[in-house]
Amino acid sequence: MKVKICGITHPDDAREAAKAGADYIGMIFAKDSRRCVSEEKAKYIVEAIQEGNSEPVGVFPEHSVEEILAITETTGITSIQLSGEDILFKFSHLREHFSIFYVVSVYSNGQPSAALPPMNDAVTVVYDHIGGERGSPFDWKAFSPFQHNNWMLGGGVNLWNIKEGISLLNPRGIDVSSGVECPGILRKDIFLMQALINSAKELSSSTL
């Protein structure tokens, strides 16, 4: 079970997430996000996890290929998360350079908002609740993932519902942001991160 801790805004949080066993550390570059980081801050975050096994992921919802290449070169980011328009064009120009995550937005009723573009299992699909930052899950019982083996469950996963999500859907990984945050300050709670990552790893072992 892979775990991505997303919306990291501080190097100390990244370091603690990596120590707790997070596989991926996500940094958001969307200017309209409260969790948006600058290139300078992202570089410090990447440096904070260099000695561990966590992989830095840049979240680029509407950036051009040129912008993504420039930011990743400056920061040292090695994986990217994409969404938005011109996705096939971006795949074709970026897949040789990066591991890629692709976001599929899901309505509250569990229905994906759009069909899945053509892609192979090297791309990790992340299912996220439309509205993104509300911190509540979509209807997992009504949800069926596309025929794509490599996918993560996102959008409202937390320590109190992770067991239900994994037992219902058996994802390859989980993507968590607000579910491990300290209230009101956009910093991660070290103990929540540790507990959630441990739960994810233990639950995935029990479902094998």
From Swiss-Prot:
GO molecular function, one term: phosphoribosylanthranilate isomerase activity
GO biological process: L-tryptophan biosynthetic process
Pathway where this protein functions: Amino-acid biosynthesis; L-tryptophan biosynthesis; L-tryptophan from chorismate: step 3/5
Annotated keywords: Amino-acid biosynthesis, Aromatic amino acid biosynthesis, Isomerase, Tryptophan biosynthesis
Enzyme Commission identifier(s): 5.3.1.24
Classification via Pfam families: PRAI
Keyword Oxidoreductase tagged: no
Reactions that this protein is recorded to catalyse: N-(5-phospho-beta-D-ribosyl)anthranilate = 1-(2-carboxyphenylamino)-1-deoxy-D-ribulose 5-phosphate
SUPFAM superfamilies attached to this UniProt entry: Ribulose-phoshate binding barrel (SSF51366)
Domain of life: Bacteria
Record family assignment: Belongs to the TrpF family.
Protein's name according to its UniProt entry: N-(5'-phosphoribosyl)anthranilate isomerase
Species for this entry: Chlamydia trachomatis serovar A (strain ATCC VR-571B / DSM 19440 / HAR-13)
